């Protein structure tokens, strides 16, 4: 029997491709394709969906996640915009409900490897900044991938970065800061998704860069998340925990 999946945000570019991918996979049945005017909770009940893949917007992803969990389905969240306090609340709710879920800042396996390599490098390089770039339809900044990368680096590095007595002549010139790591966000036509993690040391730099040039690169990660989430009883933040 195929696993019943709802794709929420099915009319977007990622949503259309996710529907096509899951419909062509022998393990899954897409039982509903939802957009913003549809009732997510009622659709879960009507279709008896086991998984909801959320590919919507930053301004509604938290409420969508609560709805999915409270209606007994497993969330696979590919929408950025969740802050740490919201992730903590969703983690607690999944524990109470004993239901699995996945929040994936990035579904690209290459991007996950980039984050893992950057985490390893941070054990040896304490000076690091992140430059992320996306298309202009992505209205939240910085990206979920950049935030997650900063969190992973902060947890792994063995000494704090140098405190520089800099004065910003233009406010924001040094980017935003997350876990004491500067993040610079680009929004340009011609970009899909790009991230560079740039490390510096005396006499050298190390650059770890990943480029997504086609949304198809995210599909293996969506399939992997849908396969793994059925066996979880907790919320997992980051696809790297499933590799």
UniProtKB/Swiss-Prot annotation:
Keyword Amino-acid biosynthesis on this protein?
yes
What are the positions of the active site?
134, 138
Where is coiled-coil annotated?
Answer: none
Q: Which Gene3D superfamilies match?
A: Dihydrodipicolinate Reductase, domain 2 (3.30.360.10), NAD(P)-binding Rossmann-like Domain (3.40.50.720)
Looking at its record, which EC class is this enzyme? oxidoreductase
Q: Where in the cell is it found?
A: Cytoplasm
Supply the InterPro entries for this chain.
Answer: DapB_C, DapB_N, DapB_N_CS, DHDPR_bac, NAD(P)-bd_dom_sf
Q: Which reaction does it catalyse?
A: (S)-2,3,4,5-tetrahydrodipicolinate + NAD(+) + H2O = (2S,4S)-4-hydroxy-2,3,4,5-tetrahydrodipicolinate + NADH + H(+); (S)-2,3,4,5-tetrahydrodipicolinate + NADP(+) + H2O = (2S,4S)-4-hydroxy-2,3,4,5-tetrahydrodipicolinate + NADPH + H(+)
Recite the UniProt keywords alphabetically.
Amino-acid biosynthesis, Cytoplasm, Diaminopimelate biosynthesis, Lysine biosynthesis, NAD, NADP, Oxidoreductase
Q: Which GO terms describe its biological process?
A: diaminopimelate biosynthetic process; lysine biosynthetic process via diaminopimelate
**Gene Ontology MF terms in the entry:** 4-hydroxy-tetrahydrodipicolinate reductase; NAD binding; NADP binding; oxidoreductase activity, acting on CH or CH2 groups, NAD or NADP as acceptor
Record-listed NAD(+) binding positions: 9-14, 78-80, 104-107
What the protein does comes down to: Catalyzes the conversion of 4-hydroxy-tetrahydrodipicolinate (HTPA) to tetrahydrodipicolinate.
Q: Which HAMAP family match?
A: DapB (MF_00102)
* NCBIfam families the UniProt entry points to: dapB (TIGR00036)
Q: State the similarity comment.
A: Belongs to the DapB family.
Protein name (Swiss-Prot/TrEMBL): 4-hydroxy-tetrahydrodipicolinate reductase
Output the lineage of the source organism. Bacteria, Pseudomonadati, Pseudomonadota, Gammaproteobacteria, Legionellales
